[in-house]
Design a protein with these regions (language model features):
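Bacterial N-terminal signal peptides that target proteins for export
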Residues: 2-12
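N-terminal secretory/targeting leader peptides
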Residues: 12-14, 26-115, 132-133, 138-334
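Hydrophobic alpha-helical segments with strong N-terminal bias
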Residues: 5, 94, 128-129
């Protein structure tokens, strides 16, 4: 064989190897609610990029934003079944009360404790891992949206005073027993109202306020009818990176670690950003003429103390005694 032929043969062999590698590259579909170009969609794309780079192209994560693969509750079922590989979205909590831990009031009160508890080794991450394992799902990380609060169409008298009885009716979501009991202990009246009716309900005075989201969410949906925003820090809103467990198990241990590390890197980066993002949303509210009420750490601890000692015993059934015990143990509460 001439030198020229040897070069050609070598080139063909290398090309064949590359093509073989490409042929065995695996594409995983990841669904998210986030709109194209949003911070959440960018986080999903960064996760995809990290996985692609670190697996040297063995795994490609294709991101489908804006519920392109279906409503998020449908996608949740599809990930369980393996029809969709991955998602970055809320957890569907209806069929397992342990997952109420993701919005349980005052499971944490600040960004540092939320990050610790929502990362591998943390109490809430562990509880969620155990709960969704039964459904064929594995959690990889959490994309933080921010701390929760309540928006009102009216002024709120002394919102830190949990002994004051107010003539304000706050909407809680259907099934939102946890926050119904919390708000009533904090001196508010409550009413259940479907999401589709909430804007009109606040506008017409059927209810005076709403709870269950972040300042950013309130700006998106209720900016023009919100007069007061109270940053209760009652829960931490986040989307979960989840993957079908069988699909995850089919990957090599090295690639499993790459996916987990990439999700955790994106999650950690977001935890560094989310406090500033919340602060920015609060500033936007102030600029729009909305009265913004925030609390110092001592006041938040006092609110959390009331919730944990007086509200938690009433809503323990929403979580289950064993799961509540795990949460209390992680917080050093007897």
């Amino acid at each position: 064989m001439t030198q020229s032929n040897r070069k050609i043969a070598t080139l063909l062999a290398v090309t064949a190897l590359l093509l073989a590698g490409a042929a065995h590259a695996e594409t995983l579909r990841l669904s998210t609610l986030k709109q194209p170009g949003s911070e959440g969609a960018q986080a999903a794309e960064k996760f995809s990029k990290l996985v692609g780079e670190r697996t040297e192209g063995r795994i490609e994560i294709k991101v489908y934003p804006a519920c392109q693969l279906g409503d998020w509750t449908e996608v949740y079922e599809q990930v369980m079944q393996g029809a969709v590989d991955m998602a970055m979205q809320p957890l569907a909590t209806a069929d397992d009360k342990r997952l109420a831990i993701t919005w349980f009031p005052y499971a944490f009160t600040n960004y540092a404790t939320a990050k610790q508890s929502l990362s591998p080794g943390g109490a809430v991450f562990g509880i969620v891992s155990e709960a969704i394992a039964d459904k064929g799902l594995t959690p990889l990380g959490v994309y933080g949206e921010g701390m929760g609060g309540a928006g009102f169409a009216k002024a709120v008298e002394s919102p830190a005073n949990t002994e004051l009885k107010r003539k304000l009716k706050v909407r809680v979501w259907p099934g939102g027993t946890t926050h119904k009991v919390l708000l009533e202990r904090f001196g508010f009246n409550t009413a259940t109202l479907p999401w589709a009716e909430l804007y009109t309900g606040m506008q017409t005075g059927v209810v005076d306020g709403q709870i269950g989201g972040t300042a950013g969410m309130a700006l998106e949906s209720f900016k023009d009818i919100t007069k007061t925003w109270v940053q209760f820090n009652d829960h931490f809103e986040g989307d979960w990176f989840i993957i079908n467990s069988d699909k995850y198990a089919s990957l090599s241990e090295a690639d499993q670690k790459i996916l987990l590390d990439a999700a955790q890197e994106v999650s950690a980066e977001r935890f560094e950003q989310v406090e500033a993002a919340d602060a920015k949303h609060l500033d936007t509210m102030r600029q729009a003429g909305i009265e913004v009420v925030t609390f110092d750490d001592a006041t938040l601890d006092k609110l959390a103390g009331v919730a944990r000692t007086e509200v938690w015993p009433q809503i323990a059934g929403e979580l289950g005694e064993e799961t509540l015990g795990q949460l209390k143990s992680s917080l050093g509460i007897n």
